[in-house]
Design a protein with these regions (language model features):
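A short C-terminal boundary segment appended to hydrolase-like catalytic domains
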Residues: 234-269
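N-terminal active-site segment of His-dependent metallophosphoesterases
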Residues: 1-66, 141, 148
């Protein structure tokens, strides 16, 4: 039996855009050092590893990602990765664009028994388009993979399911967002992790926390938004989310009840 622990740590980082003119290696180096110091249980990278989907850009991204010291790293493709038929290079270097992983959770909660972490990651891209769609062909897989009653359920995709403030005219929510949200609600998903628009934000909706990450290592930012990644720590009673700029600055922090995710907790510690 795996030993219980106080917290389960997830690092969420996305939109590396290797090959972009505004890519900043110093941000990558700082992020890698900070991430490895946290010794995360899971790292989720929801897309846009590259600027244009070229193989050398994927190889550069793989070099950085290989330096992450974590037994579980889940990577999905973004819209930039699918440019120039880049999804073929993604599959060569990172495997399937649709993934499922599960492993021991071991953070005991008196009110909710959750024994395993189940991560279901899907490709939401339309090649050479910025728009996305999960697609009805994947709904059965979502239902099947999330059928367990005692799993902590995490859904990963690149595109947004809900609009994100500060991103201008929102055109990049997946085409079937409403249907996807309904499916996730029915199977009682706990977390939805996405990237795409370079603005981090947290939405508590229908018992889920929908957490978007910014761009971790480019200056392709909007307004006063800074490069960032997310630290998500799950304890027996709460979910603590910190939005971090590589280099150590905490840009935002929010806490939610694990039992009642729509209930936001005060930052009293």
């Amino acid at each position: 039996m795996t030993k219980e622990r106080d917290k389960f740590c997830i690092i969420q980082l996305s939109d590396l855009h290797c090959g972009d003119s505004r890519f900043d290696k110093a941000l990558v180096d700082n992020a890698l050092e900070e991430i490895n110091s946290k010794r995360p249980d899971l790292v989720v990278i929801p897309g846009d590893l590259t600027a244009d989907g070229y193989r050398d850009q994927f190889e550069e991204a793989r070099e950085y990602i290989s330096q992450i010291a974590c037994p579980q790293v889940v990577t999905v493709a973004g819209n930039h990765d699918c440019r120039n038929v880049g999804f073929l290079h993604f599959e060569d270097l990172f495997g399937s664009r649709n993934k499922t992983v599960d492993f021991d959770f071991c953070v005991y909660c008196e009110e909710i028994f959750q024994e395993k972490v189940k991560v279901v990651a899907v490709d939401s891209n339309k090649p050479d388009l910025n728009d996305g769609e999960v697609g009805r062909g994947k709904y059965d897989r979502i239902r099947e993979q999330f059928r367990g009653k005692n799993d902590y359920k995490i859904f990963v995709l690149h595109h947004h399911l809900v609009s994100v403030p500060g991103t201008g005219r929102e055109r990049n929510i997946v085409w079937d967002a409403g249907d996807v949200l309904m499916e996730l609600r029915k199977v009682e998903v706990d977390l939805v992790l996405a990237g795409h628009r370079h603005v981090p934000y947290i939405w508590p909706i229908a018992g889920m926390l929908i957490i978007n990450s910014g761009t971790v290592c480019t200056w392709r930012t909007r307004g006063y938004t800074k490069p960032s990644y997310n630290i998500i720590e799950i304890s027996a009673t709460e979910i603590d989310i910190q939005i971090m700029m590589p280099g150590g600055e905490i840009l935002n922090r929010e806490r939610y009840s694990r039992v009642h995710p729509k209930k936001r907790l005060p930052l009293d510690k």
